[in-house]
């Protein structure tokens, strides 16, 4: 197979922080500031305050078509809000939360709407969570996310038990279930709220403890203006890293040096600052992976072979790929097969290698880890120890396939049904994970719980060929080739957004004793 036809990956291009816009203007501004410092310290402080004020008074959602100028006429060019690029002349810890507010992405749902309506809203707006209001202006919301959706699916499939018998009965008899009831079934952390005048030094103490998101309010704390998630904060810090020189020492450090992740396979238990490695065998059924994520209260799980080598990743958001009737047999197929399916769904564009790579090495730099988390939009990366005949951590920098953004999933309603057994008959009209239909916005869910029979032809949704090789070869590789290309070594650890934010908090803020496992301990897990 040709070795030099692979396209440059996005991850490779993100191995160093992206350039800020108009670096010439910024350098000029910096030089002018230095001159002012020598001439008049008070003038310099005034300039810094002016820039900081300009930055904090404008949320990222209103930066489009805006131009700022300092007192000396130096223009700070238009910034694109979608790139999360902003200009700062300060340390990252002092950045006000107002800089990260995206009011255009703040969408509430009522607790009285059905689970399927809530799911449709997630898909429509390409969000991963939604605040659920009990009444307009509710300041103590619970959030609806894909973990709740997974719990709902498992409840409908009679794979889990909850104390609310009515909810159980309604789910399994096809009745509409209010989303406000479903979000109560999954343990949640408190709904943290901070005013927009607070800074990142404050919020990182919360997000670094494992809380996934924080509500940003107005100064009076009477109105929610936006939601700041762990992933958005990581993206913001990465894309503005060149504006924060104090980040560089950490970004240049390796995961091993920072003691992030379980880096010793012989260790019985990770330390309190490290995340547990939770995996599932590739030959186990997908439904078992979804159940394990529910029990362990995690949002993704590693898929490994019998030797412990990493062969893939399944996220709780992938539950959206088992929503059509034709896709339900996937639940009873293997995790290994599902990995190939979701890679296909993420797509190959014009023969480019667009596979997201969810792994790093112990010697990978924090910058490299930042880049991959941003590029894959993932909450965690798996740490692997490469085999002797596989690429080293250093060679990974020039050989990683590029990640891609998954396409928006369209889930049309289904008009037909089949009732192959008692369970599927009971669930035939259950509105599980339904999608909007342009005609009637109704979903008819029909689940074949028996799984695909050996003689039954697979539907187009499930009978997807293995992904093509990155060399533009027209022939699809065999499963063995798929594993050879993308199995990266023995799974020895995991690094999450929480791990990284907790390190930033301990190293560069006053939160020296932060426990990255605190929020997860609060949520608990089912033994």
UniProtKB/Swiss-Prot annotation:
Predominant location: cytoplasm
CC terms in the record's Gene Ontology section: cytoplasm; nucleus
Region (Disordered), start-end ranges: 1-75, 385-481
Biased composition regions of type Polar residues, renumbered to the chain: 21-31, 418-449
Keyword entries, A-Z: CBS domain, Cytoplasm, Nucleus, Phosphoprotein, Repeat
Localisation per UniProt entry: Cytoplasm; Nucleus
Biological process terms in GO annotation: cellular response to glucose starvation; regulation of mitotic metaphase/anaphase transition
Annotated CBS domain residues: 101-162, 185-243, 272-330, 335-391
Sites bearing Phosphoserine, chain numbering: 9, 42, 46, 430
Biased composition annotated in UniProt, kind: Low complexity: 52-61, 391-417, 450-462
Source organism, top-level taxon: Eukaryota
UniProt xrefs under SUPFAM superfamilies: CBS-domain pair (SSF54631)
A Pfam family assignment: CBS
InterPro entries: AMPK_gamma/SDS23_families (IPR050511), CBS_dom (IPR000644), CBS_dom_sf (IPR046342), Ssd23 (IPR016711)
SMART domains given in the database record: CBS
Ranges of Basic and acidic residues composition bias in the record: 32-48
MF annotations from Gene Ontology: protein serine/threonine phosphatase inhibitor activity
Task of the protein: Involved in DNA replication and cell separation during budding.
Family membership noted in the UniProt record: Belongs to the SDS23 family.
Descriptive protein name: Protein SDS23
Originating species: Saccharomyces cerevisiae (strain YJM789) (Baker's yeast)
Underlying gene: SDS23
């Amino acid at each position: 197979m040709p070795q030099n036809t692979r396209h440059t990956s996005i991850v490779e291009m993100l191995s160093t922080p992206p350039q800020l816009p108009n670096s010439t203007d910024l350098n000029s501004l910096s030089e002018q500031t230095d001159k002012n410092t020598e001439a008049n310290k008070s003038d310099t402080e005034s300039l810094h305050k002016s820039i900081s004020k300009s930055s904090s008074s404008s949320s990222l959602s209103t930066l489009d078509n805006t131009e700022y100028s300092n007192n000396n006429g130096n223009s700070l060019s238009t910034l694109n809000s979608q790139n999360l690029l902003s200009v700062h002349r300060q340390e990252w810890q002092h950045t006000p939360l107002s800089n990260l507010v995206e009011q255009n992405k703040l969408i509430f749902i009522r607790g009285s709407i059905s689970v399927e309506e809530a799911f449709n809203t997630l898909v429509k707006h390409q969000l991963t969570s939604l605040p659920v209001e009990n009444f307009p202006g509710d300041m103590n919301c619970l959030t609806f996310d894909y973990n709740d959706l997974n719990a709902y699916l498992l409840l409908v499939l009679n794979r889990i038990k909850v104390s609310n018998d009515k909810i159980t009965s309604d789910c399994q008899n096809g009745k509409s279930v209010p989303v406000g009831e479903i979000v109560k079934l999954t343990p949640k952390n408190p709904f943290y709220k901070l005013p927009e005048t607070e800074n990142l030094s404050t919020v990182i103490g919360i997000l670094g403890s494992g809380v996934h998101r924080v509500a940003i309010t107005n100064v009076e704390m009477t109105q929610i203006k936006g939601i700041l998630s762990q992933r958005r904060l990581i993206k913001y810090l990465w894309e503005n890293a060149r504006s924060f020189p104090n980040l560089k020492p950490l970004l240049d450090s390796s995961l091993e040096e920072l003691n992030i992740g379980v880096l010793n396979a012989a260790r019985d238990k990770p330390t309190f600052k490290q995340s547990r490695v939770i995996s599932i065998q590739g030959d186990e059924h997908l439904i078992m992976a979804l159940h394990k994520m529910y029990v362990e209260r995690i949002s993704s799980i590693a898929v490994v072979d019998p030797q412990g080598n990493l062969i893939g990743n399944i996220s709780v958001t992938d539950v959206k790929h088992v929503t059509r009737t034709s896709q339900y047999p996937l639940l009873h197929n293997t995790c290994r097969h599902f990995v190939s399916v979701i890679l296909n769904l993420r797509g190959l564009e014009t023969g480019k290698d667009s596979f997201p790579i969810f792994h790093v090495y112990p010697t990978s730099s924090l910058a490299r880890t930042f880049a991959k988390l941003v590029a894959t939009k993932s909450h965690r990366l798996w740490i692997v120890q490469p085999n002797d005949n596989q690429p080293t951590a250093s060679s990974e920098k020039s050989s990683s396939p590029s990640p891609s953004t998954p396409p928006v999933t369209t889930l049309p309603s289904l008009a037909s049904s089949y009732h192959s057994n008692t369970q599927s008959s009971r669930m035939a009209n259950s509105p599980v994970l339904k999608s909007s239909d342009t005609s009637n916005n109704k979903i008819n869910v029909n689940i074949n719980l028996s799984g695909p029979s050996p003689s039954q032809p697979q539907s187009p949704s499930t009978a997807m060929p293995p992904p093509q090789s990155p060399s533009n070869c027209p022939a699809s590789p065999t499963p063995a080739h798929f594993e050879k290309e993308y199995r990266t070594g023995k799974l020895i650890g995991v690094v999450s957004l929480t791990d990284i934010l907790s390190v930033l908090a301990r190293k560069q803020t006053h939160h020296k004793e932060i426990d990255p496992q605190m929020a997860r301990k609060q949520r608990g897990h089912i033994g």
